[in-house]
Every structure is written in structure tokens, then in C-alpha cells.
From Swiss-Prot:
<dbReference type="Pfam" id="PF07043">
    <property type="entry name" value="DUF1328"/>
</dbReference>
<keyword id="KW-1133">Transmembrane helix</keyword>
<keyword id="KW-0812">Transmembrane</keyword>
<keyword id="KW-1003">Cell membrane</keyword>
<dbReference type="InterPro" id="IPR009760">
    <property type="entry name" value="DUF1328"/>
</dbReference>
<feature type="transmembrane region" description="Helical">
    <location>
        <begin position="4"/>
        <end position="24"/>
    </location>
</feature>
<dbReference type="GO" id="GO:0005886">
    <property type="term" value="C:plasma membrane"/>
</dbReference>
<feature type="transmembrane region" description="Helical">
    <location>
        <begin position="27"/>
        <end position="47"/>
    </location>
</feature>
<protein>
    <recommendedName>
        <fullName>UPF0391 membrane protein YPO0432/y3747/YP_3749</fullName>
    </recommendedName>
</protein>
<comment type="similarity">
    <text>Belongs to the UPF0391 family.</text>
</comment>
<keyword id="KW-0472">Membrane</keyword>
Amino acid sequence: MFRWGIIFLIIALIEAALGFGGLAGTAAWAAKVVFVVGIILFLISLFTGRKRL
């Protein structure tokens, strides 16, 4: 999931450098969303863990 966030961030940086402001903003927003979702899922898995009976 973090890999996708980094990919979207790189796409946003390239688009911003080439002057595609709207597309860069969309890619940056997608990178933020993917990153936040990844953090939330990581924290949930960290606290719940794998419980053995």
C-alpha cells in the first residue's frame, strides 16, 4: 500500500514539473489517501495482532 502511495507521489511530482497542475493535485491527493489508509490499517493490525488460542 505504501508502494502505491510513493508511486502516486512520484507521478504528482513529475506532473507538477511538467505543468499539469490539475493532474498533479489529483495524484497528490490520491497519494495522501493511500498513505493514510495504510497507516490506519497498520495501526489496527499492530494493536489487534495475531491471537493464538
